[in-house]
Amino acid sequence: MGLEFFFKFGYAFLTITLMIMIWMSLARASMFDREMEETHYPPCTYNVMCTCSKSSTDLGIVHCKNVPFPALPRMVNQSKVFMLHMENTGLREIEPYFLQSTGMYRLKISGNHLTEIPDDAFTGLERSLWELILPQNDLVEIPSKSLRHLQKLRHLDLGYNHITHIQHDSFRGLEDSLQTLILRENCISQLMSHSFSGLLILETLDLSGNNLFEIDPNVFVDGMPRLTRLLLTDNILSEIPYDALGPLKSLRTLDISHNVIWSLSGNETYEIKASTKLNLDNLHLEYNHIEVLPPNSFKYFDTVNRTFFDGNPIHTLREDAFKPARIREIYMRYCGLTNISPVAFDSLVNSLQILDLSGNNLTKLHHKLFNNFDVLRVISMRDNKIKIQKPTETFNAVHYTLLKLDLSGDRNDPTNLQTLRNMTRMRNMRSLSISRLGSSSVGPEDFKDFGVELEDLQITRASLSGIQSHAFKHVRGLKRLDFSENGISSIENDAFHEIGHSLISLKMSHGYSGSALPAEPLRHLTSLQELDFSNNHISSMSDTSFHFLKNLRLLELHDNRIEQVLKGTFQGDIHSKLEEISLRFNHLTSISQHTFFDLEALRKLHLDDNKIDKIERRAFMNLDELEYLSLRGNKINNLADESFQNLPKLEILDMAFNQLPNFNFDYFDQVGTLSNLNVNVSHNQIRQLMYNSSWSGRNEHGGMYHSNIKILDLSHNNISIIHPGYFRPAEISLTHLHLGYNSLMNTTRDVFGNMPHLQWLDLSYNWIHELDFDAFKNTKQLQLVFFGHNYLSDIPQDIFKPVQGLRIVDFSHNHLRGLPDNLFYNGGMEKLDVSHNMMLKIPSSSLSSLAALTLCELHLSNNFISTIHSMDLSNKFRSLRYLDISYNYLLRIDDAVFATMPKLAVLDLSHNRDLKVMDKSFMGLENSLIKLGLENISLSTVPEIRLKYLREFRLGYNELPSIPQELAHNMSNLRMLDLSNNDLTNVPLMTQALPHLRRLMLSGNPITSLNNNSFDGVNEDLEMLDISNFRLHYFEYGCLDSLPHLRSLKLTAYSHLEHFNIPHLLRHHYNIRQLWIEAPQPFTRIVKKGSGPTQEMQTLQLGNPTDLQREMEGHLPSKLTNITFSGPQFTNLNERILRGMRSPYLYMQLFNTSLQALPPNFFKYMGRVRNISLDIRYHNRNLKKIPNPNTGAVPYLPNSVFLTDLKMSHTDLNCDCDLGWVEFWQRKRRQYICSSQTWTDTVFRTFMNSPCQVYGRHNCDEHDDDLRETRCENKGGQQLMEALKFDLECGWDNANCREAAFVVVMVCVAMVFWM
C-alpha cells in the first residue's frame, strides 16, 4: 500500500511539474514577444529608416515605425527576417510572393492602408509564420484564402478593421494551429451558426467593440474544448448568452463589460438549459445597466473566482444576491451603492476573500455584514461616506484573516488608529490605507498593536502635519509608505529609524509643506529604492541629502521650487544603483561642472521646464548607461564646450524650446558613440549656423573632431545662413537632418553635398528660391526629401542624378510650373507630391520608366492642370495606387484614360468645377478602384459608372436632384456614400439597395421632412449618418429606429422644430458612441397666410440660435463618449446640457464656434462622467476663458470630474488667474498619470484598479508641447506654459484671484472695525 502511494505521488508530482513547465514556457514565450516589441535596436545597415536586431543578411527583428513606406522595404525581400513590424508607414499593399524567402515568424502591419491581402501574399511562409498581426487597416473581410495554407499560424490579429461578416470557411486550414484570434473593433453585427467550426485548439477569442446584439446558441456548438478566454466587451448585448456559452467547458474568462445587460437572470421568454453552469476565473460585467441584484442572481454559475460589477448603477444588494455561486473576489466599485443587506454575502462566507466596494455612496456598514467569514482577506471601502458605528462587532469575525484594509477617502468618517487597532487586533495586517485621522500627527503609539507583518501603509488626504520620532517602531517590517496629499511640515530626525532596513519606497507627493528637503530623517533609509517628494514646496536640498540612500533607484522631485543641485549631491560610489532622476518643473538656473558625474546606472534624467540658462563644461560626465536626457523648455543661452562628456549610450538629448543662439558640435565629447544619437534643438533662437571651431583644422597631433549625432533637429528656429562646411564634423554620421520652419534661402553643395549616409532631409517651410544643381553631389543615400512650403520656381535637372535610393519627394506648396524631364532617373520612387503649385500638366516625363514603375502615390492637387492625355498616364505607372488631381482645371476625362494603371485604388478628381465625367472614363479600373472622389464638379446627373469593388464614393457639393437606382447595382460593394450639399429633397431610394453601406452623408441638402419611414430599407448595419443642415419643417422621433447599429451621428440642433430633443431621438440607440451637434443655420421659409382672395405669402426666419438647454434635456446613450459642438452660431451653451451623460468617459470638442467662454458651472453638471478630455484647438477664435473642469482634487473620485487631457494649441487665451487652474491640474496630472512610480497603484489598489491603467502615459509630453503652442493674448503672445510657470502666481490651492482679493479686503475691513 505504501509503495502504491509513492508511485501515485510520483506520477502526480511529475504531471504537475510538467504542467508548470508548459505554463512557464508559454508565459515566457508571451513575455519574450513583449520584450521583442519594446526592445530598441540599432538602425538597419541597408536602410536606417528602420531598426534591425542583426546587421548581416539575416536582419532578425525589423521595426519600421512612423516613417513613410508606401511599399514594403526592398531589403526585406533580399534577406532572412525573423519579425517584421510596419507601424504607421502608409503601406498600401503586400505584393504577392514578396515575403517568400524571408522565413518570417511574426508579421505585424498596423496603422496602415491595407484594403485587401492577396491570395499569394504569404506564399513561402506556410511553415514559418506563427503570428500575423494586421490591426488598424482597411480590411473589410477576413483574408481566408491567403491564410488557408499557414500551417503554423497560432496568433491572428485582425482588430480595428472594417470586417463585417464571418463565414463558415473563414478560418479553414487553421484548425490545427490557431490559438489566439482577435477580431475586436470591427463591424460584426451577427455570428452565424458554426462560425468558428473546427477551431479545436483556440484558446482566446476577442470580439470586443463590435455590434453584436445577440449570440446565436449554435455559434460554439462544436465545443471548442480549449477556449479559455472569450471577450465580448463593448457590444450591445442585452443579456448573458448562457445557451451559447454552455458548450465551452474550458471557459475561464468571460468579459461582457460595457454592454447593455440589465440582469444576470437571462431571457425569460425561453427556458435556459438547467445543465448550463459556468465555472469561471474572471467574470467582467463592468459598466452595464444592472440596477439590482435579486436573490439567486448567480443561478447559472457554479464557481466565479473574480466578479467585476464596476460602474453599474446598482443601488441595492439584497439577501443571497450571489447565491448559489462560489465567489472568491467581488469588485463593485463606482456603482452608487447606498444600501447593502446584512445577509447579502452570507452565501459566500466560506469562499469570499476580497471585497472591494470603493467609490460608492455607502453611509454605514451593518455590524453583522462580515459575520462568519472565515477567509476574507481584503476589504476596500475607499471613497464612500461610511461611519462605522460598531467597529468592534463589524470586524470581529475577520480580525485573524484580514490582510488588507482600505478606509481612505475624505468622505469617509475620520479613522482613529487607536480605535482601529483595538477593534481589530490586526496582528496579521499586511496593508492599510486610511484618510482623515483623528489627530494631525503620527506617533509610535498609533501602531502599538499592529504586527511586524504590516508592509504597506498609506495615509493620504489626512491633513497630517507631523511625523514623530520612532513613529514606526512597532511596525518594523514596513516596505512602502505613502503620505501623499497631506501638509506635513515636521518630520523628526528619528521618525524612520526603525524601518531603515526594510523600507524600499517612500512617497510624499503633494504631502510635504517644508521648504527644504528633510535630509536628516532620510539618512536612516539605507534600503530605500524609490523616493517621491514631487509636487511640493521644496526650494532647497543639501548636498548630503541622499548620501545614505545607497540603494536608491528612482528619485522624483518634479514640481517643486528647487533652485540648485549642488555639486556632490549625486556621487558615483554611493549612488551606483540610481537609474532615474526627475527634477522637471523646478526653478534650477544652471548646471555646474560635475553635477551629474560617474553615475554608472543612470538611464533617464529629466531636467525639462526649469529656468536653466547656463550649462558648464563637463556638467554631464561619465554617465555610461544614460539613454535619455531632457533639457526641454528651459532658458539655455550658454552651453559650454564639452558640456556633455563620455555619454556613450545616450540616445535622446532634448534641448528644444530654449534660447540657444547657436549650436556647436564642440558641446559633445564621446557622446552617443554606442547608440543612435538623436539631438533636438528645435524651437530655439538660432539665426546662423556658423563655422564650427571643432573643424578649425587638425589638432597638434593631426587628428580631427567627429560628431556621433545621427538625427539632428534644427527646425523651428530662424536660421537664414549655414556656413559652408558647418556640418563637416557630422557629415559621416548624420542620417536625419531636420531644418524645417526656418528662413533658409538656398541649398548648396558646400552645405549638403557631402553627407554619404544622410537619408532624411527636411527643408520644408523655408524661403528657398533655388537649388544648386550639385547640392547632393556626394549625398548618395537620400531616401526622403521635403521641400514643401518654399518659393521654388525651378528644379535643376541633374540635382537627383547622384542619389541612388530616392523614394519620397515633396515639392508641395511652391511655385513650380513644371518639372524637368528625367528629374527622377533612378528606380525606386514611391511617392511624389507636387500639390499646391502651378503645374500645367502631369509630370510623367519627369520620371524615367524605371522610376515610374515603382511609384505608389502621386499628389497633383491644387495646380493648373486642364487635361489628362493618354500619354500622361502611359504604361509607366503600373504600381500607382493613389492619384490625387483635385482642385485643378480639368475639363474632360477621356475614355479609359486610367486603364494603364491596373493597381489604382484611390482616385480623387474633386473640385474641378467644369469637369465632364463620361460613362467610360473609368474603364479599366473595375477590379482595382476602391475610393473615388467627384465632389464639386458641377454634376447634375450621375454618369453610369461600373465599379463593382468601389467602397467609398464622394459626390458632395454637386447639383444632383436625385440618384439613379442603377448606381447601387453598379457599385454593390459601396460602404461609404457622401451626397452632402446637393439638391436632394429626400433620402435617395438607391441607398436601400446597398447591402454593405456603413456610412451615409446627406448634410446640406434641402430635405424638408424626416418621418419614421425615411430610412426604412437602408442597411440596418449603418454605423455613421450625417443629417445636419437640413431645412426641416417636419420631423418624427422614430426616423432613426430602423438603424439600430448607429455608432456616429451628426445632426443639427433644429431649434425651430417644436419639442426637438436629441436624447429622446436617441432613446433606443444603445450603440451611439459619437455625436456631432451643429448649430442651427438661419434660413427662410415662405408660408401661405389666410385663404381665398386675402391669402398672402409670408416669409418666416427659422434656425434661430440656441444654447441647447431644451434640445439636450434628458438621458443620453450610455456608450456615448465623444461629443462635438460645432458652428459659429453657437455663442452660448447652457451649463446643464451634459447632465444626461451616462458614460464615465467623455471627449468633448469645440469646433468653429463663436463661444467667448464656457459657463462657470459647466463641468459641475456632467452626469456620470468621471474623466473628461477637452479639445478646443480648431477655430474657436472668440474663446478666451475656460472654467476649471476638475471638480475633484485627485483622479477618479466618485461623483466628481477629473480632466485627463487638454488640447488647445494655436489658440489665444486670456492668461490670468481664471486660467491658473491649468498649472494646478498639470501637477496633479504628472503626479497621478505621468509618474514613473507605480507601486502605489499596484499595492494600495485591488485588482485591475489603477488610475494609470485608466489614463495611460502615452501623451504626457505631447500635452506639455500643446501648452507651449498656446499663446496668451493679453501677454504679447507669450507661451501659456511659460506664463503658468513664472507669471501666473494664483496660489497653490488654485484660488481665484478675485475671490482671494475679496477675502483680503473683507479681513482688512473687519480688522479696522475691530480696532
From Swiss-Prot:
<dbReference type="Pfam" id="PF13855">
    <property type="entry name" value="LRR_8"/>
</dbReference>
<dbReference type="GO" id="GO:0035996">
    <property type="term" value="C:rhabdomere microvillus"/>
</dbReference>
<feature type="repeat" description="LRR 22">
    <location>
        <begin position="708"/>
        <end position="729"/>
    </location>
</feature>
<dbReference type="InterPro" id="IPR003591">
    <property type="entry name" value="Leu-rich_rpt_typical-subtyp"/>
</dbReference>
<feature type="domain" description="LRRCT">
    <location>
        <begin position="1211"/>
        <end position="1274"/>
    </location>
</feature>
<feature type="glycosylation site" description="N-linked (GlcNAc...) (paucimannose) asparagine; alternate">
    <location>
        <position position="77"/>
    </location>
</feature>
<feature type="repeat" description="LRR 28">
    <location>
        <begin position="854"/>
        <end position="875"/>
    </location>
</feature>
<feature type="glycosylation site" description="N-linked (GlcNAc...) (high mannose) asparagine; alternate">
    <location>
        <position position="692"/>
    </location>
</feature>
<keyword id="KW-0433">Leucine-rich repeat</keyword>
<dbReference type="GO" id="GO:0007156">
    <property type="term" value="P:homophilic cell adhesion via plasma membrane adhesion molecules"/>
</dbReference>
<feature type="repeat" description="LRR 4">
    <location>
        <begin position="152"/>
        <end position="173"/>
    </location>
</feature>
<feature type="repeat" description="LRR 3">
    <location>
        <begin position="128"/>
        <end position="149"/>
    </location>
</feature>
<feature type="glycosylation site" description="N-linked (GlcNAc...) (high mannose) asparagine">
    <location>
        <position position="1171"/>
    </location>
</feature>
<protein>
    <recommendedName>
        <fullName>Chaoptin</fullName>
    </recommendedName>
</protein>
<feature type="repeat" description="LRR 5">
    <location>
        <begin position="177"/>
        <end position="198"/>
    </location>
</feature>
<keyword id="KW-0844">Vision</keyword>
<feature type="glycosylation site" description="N-linked (GlcNAc...) (complex) asparagine">
    <location>
        <position position="1012"/>
    </location>
</feature>
<feature type="glycosylation site" description="N-linked (GlcNAc...) (high mannose) asparagine">
    <location>
        <position position="680"/>
    </location>
</feature>
<feature type="glycosylation site" description="N-linked (GlcNAc...) (high mannose) asparagine">
    <location>
        <position position="1152"/>
    </location>
</feature>
<keyword id="KW-0325">Glycoprotein</keyword>
<feature type="repeat" description="LRR 10">
    <location>
        <begin position="326"/>
        <end position="347"/>
    </location>
</feature>
<feature type="repeat" description="LRR 27">
    <location>
        <begin position="828"/>
        <end position="849"/>
    </location>
</feature>
<feature type="repeat" description="LRR 31">
    <location>
        <begin position="928"/>
        <end position="948"/>
    </location>
</feature>
<feature type="repeat" description="LRR 9">
    <location>
        <begin position="279"/>
        <end position="300"/>
    </location>
</feature>
<feature type="repeat" description="LRR 26">
    <location>
        <begin position="805"/>
        <end position="826"/>
    </location>
</feature>
<feature type="glycosylation site" description="N-linked (GlcNAc...) asparagine">
    <location>
        <position position="422"/>
    </location>
</feature>
<comment type="function">
    <text>Required for photoreceptor cell morphogenesis. Mediates homophilic cellular adhesion.</text>
</comment>
<feature type="repeat" description="LRR 8">
    <location>
        <begin position="250"/>
        <end position="271"/>
    </location>
</feature>
<feature type="glycosylation site" description="N-linked (GlcNAc...) (paucimannose) asparagine; alternate">
    <location>
        <position position="267"/>
    </location>
</feature>
<keyword id="KW-0716">Sensory transduction</keyword>
<feature type="glycosylation site" description="N-linked (GlcNAc...) (complex) asparagine; alternate">
    <location>
        <position position="267"/>
    </location>
</feature>
<dbReference type="InterPro" id="IPR001611">
    <property type="entry name" value="Leu-rich_rpt"/>
</dbReference>
<feature type="repeat" description="LRR 21">
    <location>
        <begin position="676"/>
        <end position="696"/>
    </location>
</feature>
<keyword id="KW-0732">Signal</keyword>
<feature type="glycosylation site" description="N-linked (GlcNAc...) (paucimannose) asparagine">
    <location>
        <position position="970"/>
    </location>
</feature>
<feature type="repeat" description="LRR 34">
    <location>
        <begin position="996"/>
        <end position="1017"/>
    </location>
</feature>
<dbReference type="GO" id="GO:0016028">
    <property type="term" value="C:rhabdomere"/>
</dbReference>
<feature type="glycosylation site" description="N-linked (GlcNAc...) (high mannose) asparagine; alternate">
    <location>
        <position position="77"/>
    </location>
</feature>
<feature type="repeat" description="LRR 2">
    <location>
        <begin position="103"/>
        <end position="124"/>
    </location>
</feature>
<feature type="repeat" description="LRR 6">
    <location>
        <begin position="201"/>
        <end position="222"/>
    </location>
</feature>
<feature type="repeat" description="LRR 7">
    <location>
        <begin position="226"/>
        <end position="247"/>
    </location>
</feature>
<feature type="repeat" description="LRR 29">
    <location>
        <begin position="879"/>
        <end position="900"/>
    </location>
</feature>
